[in-house]
Amino acid sequence: TSKISTTYEEEGRQSKIQPRAFVITRSGPTSRSSSYSARQSYGSRSSITPGVYQQLSSSGITDFRGTREKEKREMQNLNERLAGYIEKVHFLDAQVKKLEAENXXXXXXXXXXXXXXXXXXXXXXXXXXXXXXXXXXXXXXXXXXXXXXXXXXXXXXXXXXXXXXXXXXXXXXXXXXXXXXXXXXXXXXXXXXXXXXXXXXXXXXXXXXXXXXXXXXXXXXXXXXXXXXXXXXXXXXXXXXXXXXXXXXXXXXXXXXXXXXXXXXXMDYAEFWKSELSKCVRDIQSAYDEKIDIIXXXXXXXXXXXXXXXXXXXXXXXMQLQHVQEEVKKLRTQAGEKNAAYAEXXXXXXXXXXXXXXXXXXXXXXXXXXXXXXXXXXXXXXXXXXXXXXXXXXXXXXXXXXXXMELEIACYRKLLEGEESRVGLRSLVEQAIGVQGRGTASLKDTIQQSTASGSMTVQRSSKGPIAFNSVDQSGSNIVIENTTSGARAKTQSLKGWRVDKTVAGRVAASIELKNYDLPPNTKYTIWAKGAKDRATADNEQIADMFSLGVG
């Protein structure tokens, strides 16, 4: 049978329910088992019965069936360690992937930078710009790189025209991507600088200005930068028509900014636009002065030539005089036209300035109104708070009164239930309390009896280490204790624990325990407010309730 039991343990756990197939026979006293024959079918192990084994193991003697259990435990440990390793491997794998992605991004950026640095030839720079534009469609960071590339191209200044074209393309790309508004503004500024350097492509500069205006329409935040760029373009351009276009663009920008004035308040708008408009006006005036000077110089030269010719021949002089007079007329009409245009522009500027001032005044008025409304709201809130405080005081008074009223209500209810027999107040009170006067001396005794016979349940058991030890009948204190002992003994911090009092399924009061470490098998007392003045030991606490519950 010993061999049978070992094979049983190696095979693992068979079902405990086995058919009784063995034959019970009477055997000789010499035979080993007197109850039944030793020829047991199946390996019903005769080593130890399950009940005995259970008792032994619960009393701490375990190693009867030891080898198998040890194997099981070792397998469990190995499995846990394997799971830990697998988790680590997953984590490292994720980190490696992240680092690889970062490396790739860094390499791409480095490659782009290297390409920009290496491209000395104009064609190579143009190709790099095209590549950057393609990247810009892909990502915003690439757009920043494109801006850097444009700056590099401007610095190289190998082919100014090509650089301008590339800048225009970059500006278009920036316009396409609304996300990189700031980048677009920077690109526009770069484009303006490039246009100034080129100075040949005035039309390109105008286009850039238009693009800047569009960008301003797209993002009002960059409007100031756009206006500055427009002013720079106006200064750079010598052509009067271009200047007029720039002025129109500036006016449009001013209108847009005036519309956006209410949105954000960073600086006094009226002053800012006044200074900006005066700048523009000054530029225009200087341009017109130059034009008039040139015209006058040309007229003087023509007159000198006419005088020299007149000295040569009188008839020819008469003819030339007529010509000169015609020329002077033409020039005068031109000057008149120019002056009229300038006056118009000045009038428009004045009107825009007036509009800006009006908008600023309106904004100030709105702000004042908002402040007044806020003050009124604050006053209303204060009044409401005072009312709420008064209501809270009234509620407290009502709650105090309610307790006194409940007994009276019970008595009146008894009266109303229609007992015809005239009943004394005392028996009424006894009925309400639920006590028949068992020869008690006075009403006070009955009430005390009823409080003693009332019921209050306390949660004695607890899942955690802390349980109730005792609860005072008169409601003056509650004692809790740390019940851990033996191997599970540990100190428990009371921080964050509460003692709740529930009445009819609703939490009537909850007491937050103070931050105190309660060692095992130690008590902690919670006193009601009137029962004790102050905590004498540090394992005590005074609650802010007058009674913790009676009964």
Swiss-Prot record:
| Stretches the record annotates as Linker 12 | 259-275
Residues annotated as region Coil 2? 276-423
Q: Where is this region: Linker 1?
A: 107-120
Subcellular location per the Swiss-Prot or TrEMBL entry: Cytoplasm
Q: Where is the IF rod domain?
A: 71-423
Q: Which GO terms describe its cellular component?
A: cytoplasm; intermediate filament; nuclear envelope; nuclear lamina
Region Tail, residue ranges: 424-551
Which residue intervals make up region (Disordered)?
Answer: 1-54
Q: Which residues cross the membrane?
A: none
* Keywords assigned: Acetylation, Coiled coil, Cytoplasm, Intermediate filament
Region entry Coil 1A, spans: 75-106
Provide the positions where the record notes the PTM N-acetylthreonine. 1
GO terms of biological process kind: heterochromatin formation; nuclear envelope organization; nuclear migration; nuclear pore localization; protein localization to nuclear envelope
Is Zinc-finger among the key words of this record? no
Q: Where is the composition biased (Low complexity)?
A: 25-47
The entry lists its GO molecular-function terms as: structural constituent of cytoskeleton
* Ranges for domain LTD: 454-551
- For whether the record's keyword set contains Acetylation, the answer is yes
- Give the span(s) annotated as Coil 1B: 121-258
Tell me the protein family, please: Belongs to the intermediate filament family.
Q: How does it assemble?
A: Can form homomers.
| Protein name per the record | Non-neuronal cytoplasmic intermediate filament protein A
Q: Which organism is it from?
A: Helix pomatia (Roman snail)
From the broadest rank down, the organism's phylogenetic lineage runs: Eukaryota, Metazoa, Spiralia, Lophotrochozoa, Mollusca
